[in-house]
Amino acid sequence: VVVGYSQQRKISSIGSQSSLKVSDIKMPSASLTSALVGRLSGVIAVQRTGEPGKDASDIWIRGYSTPNNSNPLMIVDGVERPFNDIDPGDIESITVLKDASATAVYGVRGANGVVIVKTKPGIIGKPVVNVDYYESFTQFTKQPKFADGITYMNTANEALTTDGLSPMYLPSYIKNTESGMDPLLYPNVDWQDVLLKDGAMTYRANLNMSGGGSTARYFVSLSYIDEEGMYKTDDAMRKDYNTNPSSQRWNYRLNTDIDVTKTTLVKVGVSGSLKKRNAPGQGGNVWISLMGQNPVSIPVMYSNGYIPAYGEGDDRKNPWVLATQTGYQEIWNNKVQTNISLEQKLDFITKGLSFEGRFGFDTDNHSQINRVRMPETWRAQRERDDYGGLLFQNRSIEKPMEQTSSSTGERREFLEAILQYNRAFKAHHIG
């Protein structure tokens, strides 16, 4: 097993650890951290959001350990780096080091435990091609149940009169709403039903090939994952842009092992991912509005296509408008991870002695384009004209589409050298 900066026989390891093979987590989940839930003892994964492309979980090993940050140290192929964007089909094994004896070699960085990921190497033999394809249907784990409009108005009136205040809704208003005869002036809207779909599809595909001979071996893979969003969208807008939260990710990997001599092994690994996320122009404000909008203030849209302004006594914006009419955000993330290692046996000095040097170079570039607009809004009066038409009052003018953009980037370098001694003397083993 992989322990600290080296590999060790499992029987010789006294530290607490758990191991997992990739065959145990074959599933269409886009988040590798979430896929670990329930598969490794002592590992807790807390998902902060289910938004496509942002659904990575916080991992705790044996609970919350340190006050500021309880995420464990993550090691991929010997280099400290995150692993959530790695395709599960590229992973050979995952090892979790839990207690102090297992993580001591990492010092304070291993205080919250260590997660060690080893990707697949090349194998000796004829080329072997594997193709995996998965589909899944994602649903909300739990949705809050809100009161309908009639219950809401009666409860609001009861709360006000209990405090000695005047009721907010007149009996005639409640009666007109209950009749459903004029839903534009007396709406009763289930905003969750208007905005949210029953579920969304996730698709994941992986193509990999491995092979090689006694001198050189290789593993190469390509993968793609597509997460659809859970919002209902305005079909009229889709011809121009998509406001539904969604995520697409492309991954590639090349691992090669080359025996330069009988005692010298060179390993080269190059991998990367390109992720595109889509979101409404107002982003997180959609959920704030959805959870706070009462059902009787405004309709979704007027019959003439006018967008309703704020409801009476309610300063929150129409959640459907925020999700479908305010433009969109496009976020791109490009990662490249490389590592080169040299393993040299030094048996000519003493049997069992070896040297290993490793260099890693990672780049992470992030760019975001925001194209945001606000539509013109109207307020319908509480009476109709002589011909039965609605009377409108303009409440805000249209703000045309504006574009802003930003980009950031970082690079990380990793260098280490290890001298190991591993030898057996009859029934005794040193290493």
Predicted regions span which residues?
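Short, intrinsically disordered, charge-balanced linker/junction segments flanking boundaries
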Residues: 1, 417, 421-431
